[in-house]
Amino acid sequence: MASLIYRQLLTNSYSVDLHDEIEQIGSEKTQNVTINPGPFAQTRYAPVNWGHGEINDSTTVEPILDGPYQSTTFTPPNGYWILINSNTNGVVYESTNNSDFWTAVVAIEPHVNPVDRQYTIFGESKQFNVSNDSNKWKFLEMFRSSSQNDFYNRRTLTSDTRLVGILKYGGRVWTFHGETPRATTNGSSTANLNNISITIHSEFYIIPRSQESKCNEYINNGLPPIQNTRNVVPLPLSSRSIQYKRAQVNEDIIVSKTSLWKEMQYNRDIIIRFKFGNSIVKMGGLGYKWSEISYKVANYQYNYLRDGEQVTAHTTCSVNGVNNFSYNGGSLPTDFGISRYEVIKENSYVYVDYWDDSKAFRNMVYVRSLAANLNSVKCTGGSYAFSIPVGAWPIMNGGAVSLHFAGVTLSTQFTDFVSLNSLRFRFSLTVDEPPFSILRTRTVNLYGLPAANPNNGNEYYEISGRFSLISLVSTNDDYQTPIMNSVTVRQDLERQLTDLREEFNSLSQEIAMAQLIDLALLPLDMFSMFSGIKSTIDLTKSMATSVMKKFRKSKLATSISEMTNSLSDAASSASRNVSIRSNLSAISNWTNVSNDVSNVTNSLNDISTQTSTISKKLRLKEMITQTEGMSFDDISAAVLKTKIDMSTQIGKNTLPDIVTEASEKFIPKRSYRILKDDEVMEINTEGKFFAYKINTFDEVPFDVNKFAELVTDSPVISAIIDFKTLKNLNDNYGITRTEALNLIKSNPNMLRNFINQNNPIIRNRIEQLILQCKL
């Protein structure tokens, strides 16, 4: 039958030549792969060896341990620890602001009996009585608050590392005291912190306060071994003062130059304007259901002034890592519902590809030292009213995210006429106020930005910032480096797909019932499915190859692959156990369906939720245990074939995406049934479940345990004519037991007979299935 086409795609039976593989790899790297290469990026290798040139980087990386520096007198900055490495007994340092703070630290070697010693402090000779009965060095902190007062020992540090620290911060002077390895800090307040200077008599280091834990570690445990070698030579403190040359915002600098090539550094300030694209697809039927609200790629072109120069810019905005939400207002055809709507949140990313007509982008082929800095922007969602035929319209309203710059790399933008080498700016997201809601529904106070109206009536969102890069260009300024992608002009594939989806959805009304049933019964293969596009066999095979490669990554192919792995695991586990049957029922061959059912409680809501999940998985079992009846995939493939033949826009580039989307999105509302004697058990993707007798169509209680047993061993049948349609048909026309059984089994001949008789109930059911074949 027609669903054979899906099984053929799943078997990956078509060979792929090397040219196709190379073409696919190049395409994937250009379109789908985003990397963050750090400070170096290139699209092609350069034709000559690069010189190192001048590397300008505005990022200051502050070392944890800066030094050692020679002894000196200076005013230390606030917020930095001065770590002094004492190498002799005597005065280690003196510090004062000449108003309310005088302090000096003297070092006492181990094993010193009480003795009077003379020290020269602040130009004065002072005598202190000192002693040290321990095996470690002692550092006495002598302090006075006025030039008229005497010094006294305020704190003592006992240390085997011989390191002393002092910090100016928060209106206080902080030092270490106690005994290593458990020395701690304490502070002394002063009214004139900024004017405190220090005279250091030993070599010292500078550590930022943000690394105070490291300073504490050094005080208590000693410096790293590399600092204790004779190869480390103290430098004068003046070597720490570097004259920084700040680059202009917009300038071109020659970094290095040879006879044919030169490296140019381009510094640019930029204004990025972008907008989100979206697609809203309404389902067929009575007009109360929406199938998809999704983000799409959006291009935007604009002009702005940069240093008095008019700049023409082009941006492409896309999103990654979207979150899928849904809303189901009920099971009736007049109940409002959205099968899937996309929301971007904290786990999502926004990509903006930027190009302008300046020299920086003219030769953007060989690039290094790429860096950027951009502001953040808040994007707030607007309102979208769902125009249902009767009743108050539900309105999706609100939602907001903030975009924060997270990286930049090279990219290529595809426009209708040319491909542009661009910069791709990546933004991470944080959710913001307000939350979004769907008025007149239960969906309230959810955070993120939904795809319904992400631009909120704004023509664009705007971000300002700057970037810098070094590009290898020709010495001849009139020469433009060839760009590989500019050899061929490529139409925007996403735009083609959007137009094709609209055409496909509009063709649903033109499909004849009899033609559909006949086509669904044919064993469609690759050639017959795609031969309607072009007559040549070679092109058809090439198309089939492209479709197969794209189809590999579809949800259906992935699910089949996972199911195969489960089968393999179940078989290997069963072979090691005595009870094969019990083991196979525990590890079922469509990802534990029987377990899901058997774990269901007697609660109606729980059964509804579980059966909805299970019914979506039963499609996989039906595909590997084909029955004589017609399946939903037969109808799906037949509709796909019909629309391909009728389409005027289908082509080699768009066909793989359309076939893959059709396998995932055609007929989202499916029902499956299992027969046992004269009883039928039926479940659907909306969570409804029925059990009824074949003869009378009278409902009987739905036995969950019985269903769990049957679903493991019995064949699964697509409920083309579902229970509601069967009951309606029997009540209005009356059908025999044989007709009922054939309709229950989805017998194609019986379906064709009812279609030929122009039965309105059966015809309406098939029409509804065709209308569900939307993209």
UniProtKB/Swiss-Prot annotation:
> In its keyword annotation, does this UniProt entry include NADP?
no
Source taxon at top rank: Viruses
Q: Which residues form a coiled coil?
A: 483-517
Hydrophobic, as annotated region: 388-408
Spell out the residue ranges making up region: Spike foot: 509-775
Which is an annotated Pfam family here?
A: VP4_helical
Q: Which GO terms describe its cellular component?
A: host cell endoplasmic reticulum-Golgi intermediate compartment; host cell plasma membrane; host cell rough endoplasmic reticulum; host cytoskeleton; membrane; viral outer capsid
> Which residues are marked as site: Cleavage?
R230, N231, R240, S241, R246, A247
Q: In chain numbering, where does the motif YGL motif fall?
A: 447-449
Q: Where is this motif: KID motif?
A: 643-645
Record region (Spike head): 65-223
The similarity comment for this entry is: Belongs to the rotavirus VP4 family.
What remark does the entry add? This strain probably does not use sialic acid to attach to the host cell.
Could you tell me what this protein is called? Answer: Outer capsid protein VP4
